[in-house]
Amino acid sequence: MASSPLPGPNDILLASPSSAFQPDALSQPRPGHANLKPNQVGQVILYGIPIVSLVIDGQERLCLAQISNTLLKNFSYNEIHNRRVALGITCVQCTPVQLEILRRAGAMPISSRRCGMITKREAERLCKSFLGENRPPKLPDNFAFDVSHECAWGCRGSFIPARYNSSRAKCIKCSYCNMYFSPNKFIFHSHRTPDAKYTQPDAANFNSWRRHLKLTDKSPQDELVFAWEDVKAMFNGGSRKRALPQPSAHPACHPLSSVKAAAVAAAAAVAGGGGLLGPHLLGAPPPPPPPPPLAELAGAPHAHHKRPRFDDDDDSLQEAAVVAAASLSAAAASLSVAAATGGAGPGAGGPGGGCVAGVGVGASAGAGAAAGTKGPRSYPVIPVPSKGSFGGVLQKFPGCGGLFPHPYTFPAAAAAFGLCHKKEDAGTAAEALGGAGAGSAGAAPKAGLSGLFWPAGRKDAFYPPFCMFWPPRTPGGLPVPTYLQPPPQPPSALGCALGDSPALLRQAFLDLAEPGGAGGSAEAAPPPGQPPPVVANGPGSGPPATGGTGARDTLFESPPGGSGGDCSAGSTPPAEQGVTSGTGSASSGAGSVGTRVPAPHHPHLLEGRKAGGGSYHHSSAFRPVGGKDDAESLAKLHGASAGTPHSAPAHHHHHHHHPHHHHHHPPQPPSPLLLLQPQPDEPGSERHHPAPPPPPPPPPLAPQPHHRGLLSPEGTSCSYPSEDSSEDEEDEEEEQEVDVEGHKPLEGEEEEDGRDPEDEEEEDEETRVLLGDSLVGGGRFLQGRGLSEKGSGRDRTTPAVGAFPLALNSSRLLQEDGKLGDSGGSDLPAPPPPPLAPQKASSSGGSRPGSPVHHPSLEEEPSYKDNQKPKENNQVIISTKDDNFSDKNKGHGFFITDSDSSGDFWRERSGEHTQETNSPHSLKKDVENMGKEELQKVLFEQIDLRRRLEQEFQVLKGNTSFPVFNNFQDQMKRELAYREEMVQQLQIIPYAASLIRKEKLGAHLSKS
């Protein structure tokens, strides 16, 4: 390394340009190097970066993973691996004990399962090959290595480096016959001398000469050994720099970065990445292409090309994120602004601070351009696996950006989702997106994005985990599953800016997952144009999704048509509803409603729905509650700003809704959150939202009988959708269901009563939260979720099964959104509450949107049955439903209070039509079915989920509207998610099948 003319060892890799890595700096002698004890931890300064070392087998070895994540973070794993192989560096796997030592030393993340250790010399060579000039070793003109091999009878010769100018160069002179051979041929050349003993060639092949050819001198000088290592590394794929202009292009990176100031990619490349990568050749050629970023802003496809795959380090990622934001922003101006803001922050922070400003500008100014850039490549480009290959953003090479177009057509997708960012790139992108301009080292920005979008680190990012926010809807209006990356999505002029993308993505996924995909699709499709702006307004967590929800809800409402609409859609509508619910919270929240809903009546998601579908369904109306996840995000984002007004109207509508929930109540489009909010309203209202009135738990009980009738709307509310996200609730409700069947008439009150205390209590919080939040359901749901989890021990326990199924549904719809995106039930729970809120959500669902949201699915099946009854006898059945709740609440009051009511409400609402049949059935099997119903619910839930999954899968499979799915990663993610859910269902069904199959399955099938 000493030979390499790099800056001092103290230079920080990121801080300085290419010179940052100095050969000399590679390894600074460590004091106490002589007395090495096994597993002794040390530190080696490599190119100015401290690398943890461990004494293994008497040799000090460095953590390759740490080197890859720090010094070589700009290079893809494949690049590093190939180079390591090319250099003949063998990795020694550390033992579990050593791995733990490395973890505690901070070299490895706690989640790491293995770590390769390489010697200090090997680490220096590896880093030098990437960071140093790739120039052949300086050797005397007439120098030759005395080499020999032991293949066959063996042979000895002189390897003349001066002649080694290609992989096939005849540079080895046989010392026996004086003929010249190429290294590959020489190992097959041997003379059978009398004293030669035959040695099996040991898999000697045309490319194994580096293994078989050894220096004849058994103890050569270090300089000789190092020179030999360097020579062997020549013409070995790994060390071959890309055919880009040489590292000198580094300066180009800067201009590039300047150009990309708007484009973003060069920032990192220029500052930290440029220098580092420039030497890698990738930096040099790319700079010219990066300038196109400006063009990209203008809409130049090339620029688009460039920006997406900027390899720059953090800035690159940040800028990419900005770009992504800009692209999305093209869809949503507000988003573009946000992108600009976020991008600028990180960019400034990062090495490409200068670029950042440009980036910010590019984000806002180039929003349209970004959109245009999306256009250039609407098909996913799947570059050779390389850290950078996944996207310039991912690749930290300034130059690499040019080499590989971003796999995701829109830069934003990569940046926003940190999908393919290499190790830390994701973090950078996230930071950029978040606008966390902590790019001082660029590492900070990276970390930000990674954490923002998902916990995965850069390496994980390389194979990105499922999107944590739901993929925004595609241009076609088709929702993108949560686990699908939506590279083309940006192309869709959706307002899927990074800011809103989480919600939007969630919504998209929800729509996709919705069984009522047609409705969801149609609904989603129209709003995309409208939602983008609204979505843009979304901070990126809840609001955008909310907007999506509104549209989605409307869609759902419209497709279902009458009061039976939600239910009529069958399991499909419920899924849609559940989906809508998930997004609904957001829509009920800040103006997302307007976005998503055909009518951009931000405050009144329900209203928007009303407009969307003249006789929208209550479930639709409550879907916003269902969208608790979004609501929660919104609540967090917006505090309790808009929630109160919303909740008030919702409450009223809710109360009106409740009575007619099973009937379409187009005029009652207040968001479910609203419905939840008005717990203190009239007793009837309370009945609608008994839980919502925490202050008057008794009143809710009193109204409960009355509310039971209202509860029936719960069935109308599209219990199915709730089923999606309300698996937990379903489980808990399953118990309720049994009770419901046992004493529906009386228990409704009791159930309300039993559940009310907790529900009310939680509801109080949630109500407050919801009220506080424009999406009343949002914050409250969040709380409810927590409450549900705490309070609904049973609910959550069943969730073990129920929640799991819920996860299945959700994973397709809300769960992925909620569980992944929201990490809590807030997302998940959101869907059930919407329908729930109208009837019981206010009392239980509303009170405990979180729990209900998430339990509707669990309770949904029972709801399903009950709902059938409620369909015919809405009020009576509702009463029964209430009883159900009451019973369950009594049984599991601690959690059922919220969850149960939530789930039941959903069920009644959505399943009301279907519940009629089961009312008597339920009553008969009150006790007997308690367990069975739970299982049945789970099974039905699974069945419904399967339907939705199939639907979603079909959509994903053959829909041109989802160009995103052309992406290999998307496909893999899709398949993985599908398989995962299949497995989960398989786990659940056997347990539920035995009990459910007999009666419940038949009943369920007859219902559905």
UniProtKB/Swiss-Prot annotation:
Expression is restricted to adult and embryonic central nervous system. Expressed at high levels in the developing cerebellum, ventral metencephalon and myelencephalon at 12.5 dpc (at protein level). In the adult cerebellum, expressed specifically in Purkinje cells. It comes from the Eukaryota. Residues 724-739, 748-766 have a biased composition (Acidic residues). One of its GO terms (molecular function) is SMAD binding. Residues 280-315, 514-927 are annotated as: Disordered. It is found in: Nucleus; Cytoplasm. Residues 284-294, 525-534, 691-703 have a biased composition (Pro residues). Residues 535-544, 578-595, 842-855 have a biased composition (Low complexity). One of its GO terms (cellular component) is cytoplasm. Residues 626-635, 787-797, 856-872, 880-890, 905-915 have a biased composition (Basic and acidic residues). InterPro entries: c-SKI_SMAD4-bd_dom, DNA-bd_dom_put_sf, SAND-like_dom_sf, SKI/SNO/DAC, Ski_DNA-bd_sf, Tscrpt_reg_SKI_SnoN. It holds the Pfam family Ski_Sno_DHD. Residues 649-666 have a biased composition (Basic residues). Keywords: Cytoplasm, Nucleus, Repressor, Transcription, Transcription regulation. GO terms for biological process: cell development; cerebellar Purkinje cell differentiation; cerebellum morphogenesis; negative regulation of BMP signaling pathway; negative regulation of transcription by RNA polymerase II; positive regulation of smoothened signaling pathway; regulation of cerebellar granule cell precursor proliferation; regulation of dendrite morphogenesis. Belongs to the SKI family. Acts as a TGF-beta antagonist in the nervous system. Exhibits transcriptional repressor activity. Interacts with SMAD2 and SMAD3. This is SKI family transcriptional corepressor 2. It comes from Mus musculus (Mouse). The lineage of its organism: Eukaryota, Metazoa, Chordata, Craniata, Vertebrata.
